[in-house]
């Protein structure tokens, strides 16, 4: 899979898995919704702490990124026909976006454009950016084996 196909699959994915590193150097993986924004040569995946039920807005993934900004996100397509399988992995650095910034507004707009729930009930929690540094992907052969 080339970079453009990987980016398109990343942009169109409805849900992904976000991996961060805990203070104990253990992986912490959670499902999350996100929007990809491209500016010049930069690719950024944004997510926001929204109103879905949570114990706190100070999520483990936020604490992890404050300590170690390394992050990886994965999206994939599963099919019982394994010739249609694919995945995309994007690695980068996470950061909390400033509350009063233009970037926050752009991120929330991108999220609302992708997820109607955010348009009707705008989230007020922290916005997080993953500045993507590497993207790769794989897909199975679509043709039947001979």
Model segments located where?
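Short beta-strand segments
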Residues: 14-54, 73-76, 86
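Residues at secondary-structure transition points
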Residues: 1, 56-60, 83, 102
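Short amphipathic alpha-helical segments and helix-helix/interface helices
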Residues: 6-7, 59-62
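Charged, gly/pro-rich active-site loop segments
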Residues: 78-146
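Short, basic/aromatic recognition patches
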Residues: 1-17
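Intrinsically disordered, low-complexity coil segments
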Residues: 37-44, 55-57, 99-106, 145
């Amino acid at each position: 899979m080339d970079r453009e196909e990987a980016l398109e699959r990343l942009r169109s994915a409805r849900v992904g898995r976000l991996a961060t590193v805990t203070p104990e150097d253990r992986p912490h993986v959670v499902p999350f919704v996100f929007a990809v924004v491209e500016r010049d040569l930069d690719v950024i995946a944004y997510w926001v702490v929204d109103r879905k039920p949570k114990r706190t807005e100070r999520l483990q993934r936020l604490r992890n990124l404050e300590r170690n900004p390394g992050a990886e996100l994965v999206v994939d397509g599963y099919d019982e026909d394994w010739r249609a399988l694919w995945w995309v992995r994007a690695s980068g650095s996470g950061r909390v976006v400033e509350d009063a910034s233009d970037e926050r507004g752009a991120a929330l707009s991108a999220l609302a454009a992708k997820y109607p729930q955010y348009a009707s009930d705008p989230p007020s929690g922290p916005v997080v950016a993953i500045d993507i540094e590497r993207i790769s992907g794989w897909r199975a052969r679509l043709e039947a084996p001979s």
